[in-house]
């Protein structure tokens, strides 16, 4: 059975020193200029010292006009390097240097939110439109209140033109090239949680009838083009991974999902991170609510997407898989590895409480009963209970842990939810 302490070599040749990856989380530390601020770099200085096998950053948006939050780090949408924008390039170079100062590879999560860009987030302004594969607004519930609140927060998207698709593809490629030039070890394309790449992959949000819609393969064309064009401009040793939503075994989309994963494998993807959820179905954002007991059965429940990951492993045995969502203990992480369901264990919220969490899990002198971190549910604000949106409760969870990340940035002690 693999050990958490074992190294992992990705197809590109990048070696991760152990199997614990700090998963991407929203830091909201890009400031009003949406750049890698000193506060953001302070946080990654702590994670760099934490003993992780890999550190995945929070979202870096590829177009400052379309952000997931008003404070996401982002790029202008145009290619930059040390000559075209020396100051911004230097900020990303410093970000990479600090994040990897202690030998842990840092991988940047690149994202475009598509229709999940709230009003006022990005330079599109309050009245600017979002874009999506098809002009289908977010469906956050059938009731009048849900529909009104959804419209209030997320403007209805316009369908992307061929020119839009080519522009956004180039923005992803240019962003990846910048990260390689700045010294990061790789990128992860955010293809989950309802963001733009996921919107193309999903038939519910992509009803196009051109080369980017219809079949599972056509719906994957957008991300496959990004991968192919990125490979052409970055070193062969630069990692390209993707975060990918799980699918229910019994759903009609399961085989389509497996087909798309196969296309990603054929494209030479270095790893796939299995995750899940979106603003319409925020199960991922409610992760971390189970408490680990000392049984294998409970340890298995720590991994929310274990069954799907195991199915992917069976279909594509050589694919490097990262499983994220719910891990709180060594027992849970060991169980996932023992089931051959993943190669890497992604840990999010515990990293926002204890940036050095791997040191506890990897220290074999620490008893298994002590190698864990209990995190209780964050209470939903009383006013939110009157709003019939599942995303409200999920937002309370995410906001709490973003706040803990910001405490780390200030050098303050984090607060464990009890």
Regions found by a protein language model. Give the residues of each.
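Flavin-dependent oxidoreductase catalytic cores
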Residues: 1-418
